[in-house]
């Protein structure tokens, strides 16, 4: 997500749902820079929400919930002292509670279209999808830019029933 824009991510999400369900979703791992060093706090949260609410397995890296910035070598047995982003664990606690609902594992996922006005392309920075199971429905809209957006709202696919 570091080098992709919302449109390239949205196009990736058009892939077959069976394929999407086999993917591993994460924003950091042991051999890449830490998310806290790569993204602004707002983008960290947007990308975490994205990775956590898409189909597929979710992976969270040690220290991600605290906003750790030091990438530890595999063989280091102790961690240096780091300042912690005290708001980030609260965010992740709420996110994990939300995605623990059965709808995010057993429900029907749909990619949503988004629309705007010809003279304001800021809606192109959005990616939107929905989850549905029985009467439970969730619409996730993520702004993947550093700027505010104007949108007429996602146009949901008919099969989403929302």
Map each language-model feature to its residues:
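Hydrophobic alpha-helix feature that most strongly marks membrane-spanning transmembrane helices
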Residues: 31, 56, 100-103, 144, ...
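Trp/Gly-enriched beta-strand surface patches
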Residues: 162
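Short, solvent-exposed loop/turn elements at beta->coil junctions and helix N-caps
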Residues: 112-118
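Carbohydrate-binding surface patches
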Residues: 118-159
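Catalytic cores of secreted or luminal carbohydrate-active enzymes
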Residues: 81-108
């Amino acid at each position: 997500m570091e080098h992709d824009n919302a449109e390239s991510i949205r196009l990736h999400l058009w892939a077959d749902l069976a394929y999407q369900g086999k993917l591993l979703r994460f924003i950091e791992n042991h051999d890449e820079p830490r998310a806290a060093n790569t993204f602004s706090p707002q983008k960290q949260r947007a990308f975490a929400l994205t990775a956590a609410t898409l189909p597929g397995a979710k992976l969270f890296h040690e220290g991600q919930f605290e906003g750790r910035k030091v990438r530890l070598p595999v063989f280091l047995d102790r961690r240096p002292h780091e300042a912690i982003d005290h708001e980030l664990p609260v965010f992740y606690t709420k996110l994990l509670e939300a995605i623990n609902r059965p709808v995010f594992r057993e429900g029907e996922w749909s990619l949503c279209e988004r629309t705007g006005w010809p003279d304001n392309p800021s809606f192109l920075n959005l990616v939107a999808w929905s989850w549905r199971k029985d009467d439970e429905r969730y619409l996730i809209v993520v702004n993947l830019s550093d700027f505010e957006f104007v949108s007429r709202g996602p146009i949901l696919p008919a099969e989403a029933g929302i």
